[in-house]
Amino acid sequence: MVTGTRPLKSHRRARRGRAAGRLTTTTLATLFMIAFGVYFLLPLVWLVFSATKTNTDLSSSYGLWFAPTFALGANAHDVFTRDDSLFAQWFVNTVLYAGTVAIVSTFLAMLIGYALAKYRFRGREVIFAAILGSIMVPGTALVLPLFLLLSKAHLVNTYWGVILPQLVNPFGVYLMRVYSSQAVPDDLLAAARVDGAGELRAFWSIAARLLTPGFVTVFLFGFVGTWNNYFLPLVVLSDPKLYPLTLGLASWQTKIGLGGEMTYTVIITGALIALIPLVVAFLLLQRYWRSGLLLGSMTG
C-alpha cells in the first residue's frame, strides 16, 4: 500500500512544481510588461499634466499632478494665436503630408506586395531582396543625394519636396507581401479567373477586401512615421509656413534658447495637441491593425 502511494505523491508534487513554475513565469512576465508600460506611459502622463499648468507652476509644482491653476484652455489659446496662428498652418501641413504619404505609399505597397506574393515572374526574388536591402539603408545616408535631386528638380522648400521622397515604403511592401501570401488564398483567385474575372477585377473584388487589415496596418505605420518625421523637413524646408508640427515646435523651442518670449507651456501644449490625431487614428482603426499584426506575426 505504501509502495503504491509513492508514485502518486511524486506525481502530485511534480504537478504542483510545474504549476508553481508556470505561475512564477506568468507573474514575472506580467511585472515585466507593467514596468515597460509605465516606462512608455510616464512621459505621456507628464505631458498631459504639464499642459494644464502655467509657466510658473511648471517648475514649482509636482510633475505628475495638477497645479492649483488649471491653464489648459489658456495654453491652447496661446498655441493657436501665437505668431499669427502659425500653429494651425503647421497642423494643416502635417495632415497634408501624413495623409497624402500614408494613402499613396500604402496603396503602392499593397499593389507591389500583392504582385510579389501572387505572381511568378523572372527576377521576383531579386526585386524582393532589393526591397529588403533598402530597408537597411539609414535615412541619414540618403540626405545629401536626396537634397541634390530635389534641388535639381526645383522641389526644395515645397510641399512636394517632403511628400515625394516618402511615397515608396519598402517596409510596407514587405508587410503586404507577407500578408498577401496568407490572407488571399490562391484557390479563390483561381476560381475567380475560371468565372471570367480579369486580374484587375479579381484584385479589386476579392484581394483588396481581404487585404484591408494589412492595408490599415501599413497605413498607420506610414501615417505615424510621416507625422513624426523631423529630419526630412529640416533638410528640405526653410519657409516656416511649410513646416510640419515637428519642425515648427522645434523652431519655437529654439526661440526659448535665444531668450525670446516663447514659454515651455506653449511647446508642451502644442506637443499634446499634435498627439491627439495619432491617438484617435489608433483607436478608430484598432480592429483592423490588430488582426493585421497578428497574421503578420504568424507568417513571419
Which residues make up each language-model segment?
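A structural signal for multi-pass alpha-helical bundles of membrane permease subunits
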Residues: 26-300
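Short, Lys/Arg-rich, polar N-terminal cytosolic tail immediately upstream
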Residues: 1-20
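DHp/HisKA histidine-phosphotransfer helix
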Residues: 23
